[in-house]
Swiss-Prot record:
Gene3D superfamilies: Cytidine Deaminase, domain 2. This is UPF0758 protein Mbur_0382. GO terms for molecular function: metal ion binding; metallopeptidase activity. Keywords: Hydrolase, Metal-binding, Metalloprotease, Protease, Zinc. Zn(2+) binds at residues 177, 179, 190. It holds the Pfam family RadC. A motif (JAMM motif) lies at residues 177-190. Residues 106-228 form the MPN domain. The keyword Zinc applies.
Length: 229
């Protein structure tokens, strides 16, 4: 049993995180209070502030941001609903970073792609084909998951990749997907999909700069391997 058992509704209004946020703004709240606003409710043994404080004493924000749903639900007091709220929070934060004027969002090499996506891809149980849409200076203007599941040239259609490229006036595209096995070596289907999309890009005047396959702590660039000229 936790020592701090006062229910949120029994706390003075000026001490409740949501009311404090509304009155003073989010910058006035501690990390535990901000997390409690996201989680909304605690358990029968802990109010949400106490629960949030405990979680952040056991896991830092970086660890929480990198945890998948399965890992989050192993935390005491966190079920599927709360795990989904936490995962959605950090995914929004990651998407926001794409639109900031951050030099890390300029793609200069395949290693930049790997550094950006590996923290999210390393725990995925299925292949996720992701497109990074770039402007003329190779800054990311949009990131989009195109398909989930094993790549197949008959399933992945160029229009799914280039629809957003045209809508965003993207100058070029970088493809990336993960190999849950941990081995980033390209399969014949990986190469076939890449060749199909490169040809589709040529027709539309949108360059496919690379296809980066992410494995366990390593990656393969199909550009560097000579599959994309």
């Amino acid at each position: 049993m936790c020592g701090y058992q006062v229910r949120i509704h029994d706390m003075p209004s000026e001490d409740r995180p949501r009311e404090r946020l509304l009155k003073h703004g989010p910058g006035f709240l501690s990390n535990a209070e901000l997390l409690s606003v996201i989680l909304r409710t605690g358990s029968k043994d802990e109010n949400v502030v106490s629960m949030s404080s405990r979680i952040l004493s056991e896991y830092n924000l970086k660890q929480l941001s990198q945890a998948n749903i399965s890992q989050l639900t192993k935390i005491r007091g966190i079920g599927p609903a709360k795990a989904s709220q936490i995962a959605a929070l950090f995914e929004l934060a990651r998407k926001l970073e794409i639109f900031t004027d951050d030099p890390k969002r300029k793609i200069r090499s395949a290693n930049d792609v790997y550094s950006l996506l590996y923290p999210r891809h390393r725990e995925l149980k299925k292949e996720h084909l992701t497109a990074l849409y770039l402007d003329t200076k190779n800054n990311i203007i949009k990131e989009e998951v195109i398909s989930i599941g094993s790549l197949n040239a008959n399933i992945v259609h160029p229009r799914e990749v280039f629809k957003s490229a045209l809508m965003e006036s993207s100058a070029s595209v970088i493809l990336t997907h993960n190999h849950p096995s941990g081995d980033p070596a390209p399969s014949r289907e990986d190469i076939a999909v890449t060749e199909k999309l490169v040809e589709g890009g040529k027709i539309l005047g949108i360059s496919v700069l690379d296809h980066v396959i992410i494995g366990d702590g390593r990656y393969v660039s199909l550009k560097e391997e000579g599959y994309i000229s």
